[in-house]
């Protein structure tokens, strides 16, 4: 059975489709909550300082196929419980800024939101990945208020400059072009470019 067939089989094996839909509903709601907060912070910054630190905001929900592949890569069975427990980037927000200083200013503003709980921070700007990748990642939990309950839902926020975003996009495309076997000389050139644009 090919890996694609395994993914299809795993997706079909979700016993409770309603649970799957509910989880995705919660992640979409969390993206809306976080997106609204970020737009308000950006508007406030413009009002007070006549400057917008956020160039643009991108959001996404991981596809079911991507979720299954990631669970398998981590050695976990495909289940709703494992998806929620082990995959932190099902809901993702990417903030693109002009300057590195904007990244840290935004991270501080996000961290000061009383109803967002910062679960973890990975600063790949101060500590870039070996490949040269640079970005600031925050994993936050946002309360989703439903008619009969409140559900804390995780959202990964990536904050990076325009240059860092361009580099990350290029690296991603090259990785898939070479199917994960990027030639060493290209890796080295990418690393040098990352050092230049940061």
Q: What function would you assign to each model-found segment?
A:
Residues 1-31, 35-44, 156-198:
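An acidic, glycine-/histidine-flanked metal-binding catalytic module
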Residues 26-42, 77-86, 98-103:
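Short N-terminal helix-initiation segments at or just after the protein's N-terminus
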Residues 32, 36, 65, 69, ...:
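Solvent-exposed alpha-helical segments within well-ordered globular domains of core cellular machineries
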Residues 43-45, 75-76, 114-119:
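Short secondary-structure junctions
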Residues 84, 97-198:
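Long beta-strand-rich cores associated with HINT superfamily self-processing modules
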């Amino acid at each position: 059975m090919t890996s694609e067939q395994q993914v299809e089989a795993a997706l079909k094996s979700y016993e409770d489709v309603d649970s799957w839909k509910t989880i995705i509903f919660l992640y979409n709601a969390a993206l809306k909550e976080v997106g609204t907060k970020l737009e308000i912070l950006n508007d406030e910054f413009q009002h007070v300082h006549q400057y917008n630190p956020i160039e643009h905001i991108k959001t996404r929900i991981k596809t079911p196929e991507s979720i299954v592949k990631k669970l398998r890569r981590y050695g976990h069975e495909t289940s709703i419980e494992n998806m929620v427990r082990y995959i932190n980037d099902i809901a993702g927000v990417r903030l693109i800024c002009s300057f590195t200083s904007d990244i840290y200013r935004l991270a501080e503003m996000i961290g000061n939101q009383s109803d967002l709980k910062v679960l973890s921070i990975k600063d790949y700007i101060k500590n870039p990945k070996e490949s040269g990748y640079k970005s600031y990642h925050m994993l936050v939990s946002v309360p989703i208020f439903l008619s009969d309950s409140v559900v804390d839902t995780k959202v990964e926020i990536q904050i990076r400059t325009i240059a860092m975003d361009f580099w990350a996009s290029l690296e991603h495309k090259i990785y898939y072009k070479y199917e994960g076997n990027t030639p060493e000389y290209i890796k080295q050139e990418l690393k040098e470019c990352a050092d230049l644009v940061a």
